Structures are given as structure tokens and as C-alpha cells.
């Protein structure tokens, strides 16, 4: 049976908003000058909109559209919609990254920690680069931590005797993201000048079971959705103990290494 489409909890996701926003800021810092002013920008997989507003700070006159397929996330993002301080505009709309194709030329299409949820997303790159204006940019960031303890322990538990009948097909792994080299090859094959890199952040998290608290907002969502409240509580209890051993708390906090892969592709003018 196919896994349920994950449900999203914006409040849970935003509990680590500062840490989650850092990679997006680093991604935007590598985006070159855009070809038009005012620019037209799409944020594909905008979530609750808290980082989409950073785009308006970088390009204050831009017409920005945040796109997401989660009604819960879009409802939260609506608080940021409207005219921006620099004379631009920020709007949000429903769209699915699995099928979205630009209907008009964009100066920048950006995506932050979304494409890992899109099976076959590397095959979507041609449609997105085709949707760029001459001189435009496609920029995205994906988590590269699927072999880290936080994900490995989740998968091992999902495939254990107690849970495998319900969760064996719920979590993706090998095909969720590609290597930096694969993204570089795909983007340069499309005729783009590509800047691809990876970084491992060492997040120092505070509070009780902070790694569990983090993944409840993202990677654990398919499990929580598939199981429902009662069984999810039992799964989380087992998972919590494994995470405590893998990520021991110290007097300064809990260190959570998080690898991420970045790509910025510039289309020829």
C-alpha cells in the first residue's frame, strides 16, 4: 500500500526556525545578480513562509510567489503576504513541486529543503531551467543526511518486526537526493553555469530530546502520518531512546551534525 501523503505541522517545524533558515540564507548569498528589476521569483516548497520573506530583503522590488502543496503551511505563510517594504509584493499559492512548471519566465526559482520529497526531481530540472528568463538562476538546497543516525535509526525501527508491516515502504532513502556530482552533471548538461557544494552544519540544540523535536517537524512526518496518534506515540517512544544514545546531551546542548547539498545554476543570458 502506498504511504500516506505526509501531513505538516507548521508550529512544530518552526520550533527550530533559526537553524533551518541558515542554509537558505547561505544559498541566497550565492545567487548572482538577477536579469530584471523588478525580478519575478518563485519559492518552490515555501513552507510556512518564514524564509520566503528573506527573498524580499535581498530583492526588495521583486514580485515573489511562494508555492507549496500543504494547506497548513500556506495558511501560516499567508501572514507574510502583501506589499513589501521595497515596493515589491509577496504572495503565496498552492502548487505541487512534482508537477509544477513555470507558466511565465522567472528571474529566480529557488527551493529550500523540498526536493527530497519529490521522487525523480532531477528529471524536473529541465522544465525549471526552461522556465528561467535569460540570465536567470535556479537555486536549491536539499538535506544530505539520510545516512546519519537520525534517519538510519528511523529506518531500522520502521523495518523492525513490530512496525515493518505498516512502515516498510514509508521512508525513502537511496533515491531521496543525489550526490553533488550528479547535480553538477545534470545542470551543466542543461547549458547552465553551475555552482554546487556541500556543507555539514553542527547545530547545537537545546532542550530535552531536541533531535527528536527537530525530526518531528520534517523527516518523521511520513511515519507520524501513516501511524496516527496512538501508534505514533509508541513508535516515538522507541525512537527517542535510540536518539538519546546516538546524540548524547552535554552541558552545552546536543550537537546535531546536518549535511546539506547546494546548487546554484545560472542560465546564459
Curated annotation (Swiss-Prot):
Domain of life, per lineage: Bacteria
One Gene Ontology cellular component: cytoplasm
Localization (cell): Cytoplasm
Record field: catalytic activity: trans-aconitate + S-adenosyl-L-methionine = (E)-3-(methoxycarbonyl)pent-2-enedioate + S-adenosyl-L-homocysteine
EC code(s) of this entry: 2.1.1.144
Cysteines joined through disulfide linkages: none
Gene Ontology molecular function: any one: trans-aconitate 2-methyltransferase activity
Biological-process GO terms, alphabetical: antibiotic biosynthetic process; methylation
Record-linked Pfam families: Methyltransf_25
Entries under InterPro entries matching the protein: Methyltransf_25, SAM-dependent_MTases_sf, Trans-aconitate_MeTrfase, Trans_acon_MeTrfase_C
Keywords, comma-separated and alphabetical: Cytoplasm, Methyltransferase, S-adenosyl-L-methionine, Transferase
HAMAP family, A to Z: Tran_acon_Me_trans
NCBIfam families: PRK14103.1
Its job: Catalyzes the S-adenosylmethionine monomethyl esterification of trans-aconitate.
PANTHER family found in the cross-reference section: TRANS-ACONITATE 2-METHYLTRANSFERASE (PTHR43861:SF1), TRANS-ACONITATE 2-METHYLTRANSFERASE-RELATED (PTHR43861)
UniProt record similarity statement: Belongs to the methyltransferase superfamily. Tam family.
Full protein name: Trans-aconitate 2-methyltransferase
Gene name linked to the record: tam
Amino acid at each position: 500500500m502506498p504511504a500516506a501523503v505526509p501531513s505538516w505541522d507548521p508550529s512544530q517545524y518552526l520550533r527550530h526556525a533559526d537553524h533551518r533558515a541558515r542554509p537558505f540564507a547561505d544559498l541566497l548569498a550565492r545567487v548572482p545578480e538577477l536579469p530584471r528589476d523588478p525580478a519575478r521569483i518563485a519559492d518552490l516548497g515555501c513552507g510556512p513562509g518564514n524564509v520566503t520573506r528573506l527573498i524580499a530583503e535581498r530583492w526588495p522590488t521583486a514580485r515573489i510567489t511562494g508555492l507549496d502543496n500543504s494547506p497548513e503551511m500556506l495558511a501560516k505563510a499567508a501572514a507574510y503576504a502583501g506589499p513589501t517594504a521595497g515596493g515589491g509584493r509577496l504572495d503565496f499559492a498552492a502548487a505541487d513541486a512534482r508537477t509544477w512548471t513555470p507558466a511565465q519566465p522567472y528571474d529566480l526559482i529557488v527551493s529550500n529543503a523540498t526536493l527530497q520529497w519529490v521522487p525523480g526531481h532531477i528529471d524536473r530540472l529541465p522544465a525549471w531551467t526552461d522556465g528561467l528568463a535569460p540570465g536567470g538562476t535556479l537555486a536549491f538546497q536539499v538535506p544530505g543526511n539520510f545516512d546519519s543516525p537520525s534517519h538510519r535509526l528511523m529506518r531500522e525501527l520502521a523495518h523492525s518486526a513490530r512496525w515493518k508491516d505498516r512502515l516498510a515502504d514509508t521512508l525513502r532513502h537511496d533515491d531521496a537526493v543525489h550526490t553533488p556530482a550528479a547535480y553538477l552533471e545534470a545542470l551543466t548538461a542543461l547549458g547552465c553555469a553551475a555552482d554546487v557544494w556541500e556543507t555539514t552544519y553542527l547545530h547545537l540544540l537545546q532542550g530535552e530530546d531536541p533531535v527528536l523535536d527537530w525530526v518531528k517537524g520534517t523527516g518523521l512526518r511520513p511515519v507520524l502520518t501513516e501511524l496516527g496518534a496512538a501508534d505514533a506515540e509508541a513508535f516515538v517512544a522507541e525512537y527517542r531512546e535510540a536518539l538519546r544514545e546516538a546524540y548524547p546531551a552535554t552541558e552545552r546542548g546536543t550537537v546535531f551534525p546536518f549535511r546539506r547539498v547546494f546548487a546554484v545554476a545560472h542560465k546564459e543570458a
